[in-house]
Amino acid sequence: MKKLVCALLVASFVICGAMAASAEWKFERKVSIVCPWGVGGGADSTLRPMANLLKNILGQEVEVVNVTGGNGVTAIEYVYKQPADGYTFMLGTQSLFMQDIQGTTSMNFKDEFIPVARLVHAVNVITASKKAMDKKGYKTFSEMRDFVKDHPFEVSVGMLTSTGLDGASLKQALEGLDILDVSYPSGSEMNSALVGGHVDLMVTGTDEIAGLIEAGDIVPLLTLAEKRMNRYPNVECSVELGINSVLGPARGIFAKKGTPQEAIDALAAAVEQAAKDPSWQEFLVQGCYDERPGFAGPAEYAKACEEDYKLLSEYLKAEGVMKKDYYAK
């Protein structure tokens, strides 16, 4: 009985200590969150509504600073030069991990930046041109695979770069299929090509093409997820077909190494509170971000980032572009 009481007391002290740690930190001036991509894009559009909610919770201005260029590297370098004082954070995705692994950063992003909180975790979807589907006669991903086996290289897939997250998703999902790769300089041009039937397939987050799907111009063929999406219950998912591909864009907040843990905990707690706000919940629905759990605190998000780093390291190594091997034995 005494052991039980002692154990309960210890647990209570641990919990209270954790709560006190975040409560000890009080933001006393403006907080900046750097977005590595431009105004109006998916990352920026995710961060701004969260920043507005954080402003009310923290009682301080929360500024979104867009620092673009270098596929996110310019923002990494910018934040790395700022003091780790708890007032400068940055938004990050797996795209930054891939830049790090390819050696385009002056430092090791994996070692010098700390996951604070995940905001959203979208589902990637392989979509098809309605015009191309009607012409070639397939209606599902399984039927498309059968078509490709009989007609090698007659199906094309658009991509921005083979060394980005979408490229990794495609390579996993289409492994073993003789499909023609077509590069596009921008997502808007690729979308237009898909709608016009000039390319057969592409992969992107559901948040970016929901409107085109609703209009009937493109058709979701495969969701890269553990289970079928509630939005598209008749669309096959990768896991049910035995395809090991569930990569989806995860957007979260990172802090420079050396940032006070109290500041990290305080911001994570504020994000968790904001994530429960009805306006944020509505944003998740409107943005198609409600199919997977979004918010994750420091420990859970760090674990997810580690898993993505391992997976993307393997992919980039196979592509021959790995410059940093964090898992070399």
Per-region residue spans from a language model:
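Positively charged n-region of N-terminal signal peptides that target proteins for export
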Residues: 1-4
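Bacterial N-terminal signal peptides
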Residues: 8-16
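N-terminal signal peptide c-region/cleavage motif recognized by signal peptidases
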Residues: 17-21
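N-terminal (or domain-start) structured segment
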Residues: 23-112, 154, 163, 174-203, ...
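Hinge/capping helix and adjacent helix->loop/strand transition within the periplasmic-binding protein
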Residues: 27-30, 54-56, 78-86, 101-189, ...
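An extracytoplasmic/periplasmic, membrane-proximal ligand-sensing/linker region
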Residues: 28-30, 262-329
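Beta->alpha turn/N-cap motifs
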Residues: 91-96, 162-163, 186-187, 204-209, ...
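Periplasmic-binding protein-like
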Residues: 118-125, 222-257
